[in-house]
């Protein structure tokens, strides 16, 4: 990993989500280099964002499960309001990126943060408000390369919690789930039985069919049928690097 000290971060304003073939964009994000220098900003995952703008509203409580390097959540926050975002990420080093990007773009705090994995079992011994905190490395240097922690390859013993347990402990119930967890999608849903059953959630999930099969012996059909068992119907949005779906009870 390459680290960049906070004082050495170079910031750029990046236009994101081009409006057709015009020179107009839906968003202008303040991003750090080298992230800001990507060449994908015109249309990256545009189908997901358009679906979110169609289905979501200000005030929706949005659980972002797999916040990663901390830029997509800036767009989600614009849609539902930054004060309604719950940021969830297991990789310790990403928390500095998430923190730096968040406060470069917003002056209000997110609703909550959870530094850990979400899955089908709970190993996290923290309780209550201790589960709502920025990752311990959030004030450190940012990283400029991707580094992931996986449920199946958790060599750092990152704590894990079921979504149902998190909801119960912190007292926050989501309206929206956004899940991008590199193949472990079904495990997250299996830890969210009560929340899925008791609510009509708006669910955006990126299904990684290759990683799910390789690392978790799970097919996309397994994940889709599990959600259908709770009364959810799916809408396929797009497939580029993974398959993007939207689910709700209809």
What do the predicted segments below correspond to?
Residues 67-69, 92, 120, 181-183, ...:
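Short, glycine/acidic-enriched loop or turn micro-motifs at the edges of active sites
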Residues 21-50, 108-109, 114-172:
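Glycine-rich adenosyl-binding loop in Rossmann-like folds that engage adenosine-containing cofactors
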Residues 104-109, 196-200:
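Short helix-capping segments at alpha-helix termini
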Residues 76, 98, 102, 126-127, ...:
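Hydrophobic packing residues within well-ordered alpha-helices of enzyme cores
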Residues 86, 165-250:
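Conserved acidic-Pro-Pro-aromatic motif
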Residues 1-106, 150-152, 170, 219-226, ...:
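S-adenosyl-L-methionine
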Residues 93, 152-158, 207-217:
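Acceptor-substrate binding/catalytic loop of class I
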Residues 63, 86, 114, 159, ...:
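Conserved Rossmann-like nucleotide-binding pocket used by diverse enzymes
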């Amino acid at each position: 990993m390459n680290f960049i000290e906070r004082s050495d971060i170079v910031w750029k304003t990046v236009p994101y989500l081009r409006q057709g073939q015009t020179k107009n964009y839906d968003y202008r994000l303040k991003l750090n280099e080298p992230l800001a220098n990507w060449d994908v900003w015109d249309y990256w995952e545009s189908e997901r964002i358009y679906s979110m703008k169609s289905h979501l509203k200000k005030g929706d409580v949005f659980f972002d499960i797999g916040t990663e390097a901390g830029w997509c959540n800036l767009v989600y926050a614009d849609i539902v309001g930054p004060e309604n975002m719950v940021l969830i990420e297991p990789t310790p080093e990403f928390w500095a990126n998430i923190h730096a990007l968040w406060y470069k773009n917003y002056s209000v705090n997110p609703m909550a943060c959870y530094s850990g994995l979400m899955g089908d079992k709970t190993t996290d011994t923290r309780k209550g408000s201790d589960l709502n905190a920025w990752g311990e490395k959030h004030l450190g240097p940012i990283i400029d390369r991707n580094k992931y922690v996986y449920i199946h390859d958790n060599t750092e013993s990152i704590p894990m919690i079921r979504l149902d347990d998190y909801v119960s402990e912190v007292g926050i119930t989501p309206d929206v789930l956004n899940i991008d967890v590199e193949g472990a999608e079904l495990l997250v849903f299996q830890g969210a039985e009560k929340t899925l059953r008791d609510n009509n959630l708006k669910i955006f999930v990126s299904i990684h069919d290759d990683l799910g099969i390789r690392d978790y012996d799970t097919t996309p059909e397994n994940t889709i049928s599990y959600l259908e068992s709770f009364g959810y119907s799916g809408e396929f949005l797009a497939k580029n690097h993974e398959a993007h779906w939207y689910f709700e009870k209809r």
